[in-house]
Amino acid sequence: MLFESLGASIVTASVDTADEMKLVAEGKCFPKREKAMRFTVCHGVTHEISKTVGAFWYDHAEGKDKNYIAGESKDYMQPAEFVIDCILKKVILCSYSDGGLGRIDSGDLVGWLSGIQNRRDEFPHVWSW
């Protein structure tokens, strides 16, 4: 996998249950990839975890007039993405969102990681836009 060759690991997390996230990991629900994800998929994110990482929390009881997810009736953490340098033990890049925009693009991340490792010749970056 490309990220592994850059010394990076991908970990995802959701408020969903283990059974729901198993379907996501297997590519059997949104987004309908129809192929398994090759990275760690976690479940059970709580409001406390959201506060710990500084992410926005959608409280359904407070925001029921805003349909971020049509028909959805549960609380959830908004997208929060981090690149953590495990040697320095520091977050070196992060992105917080309150919807579908403003996320870290995987192609851009490959370019960024290869740049800080002085390996751009090995991993030529093509801007997605």
Describe each model-derived feature in a short phrase.
Residues 1-129:
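Chalcogenol-based redox active-site neighborhoods
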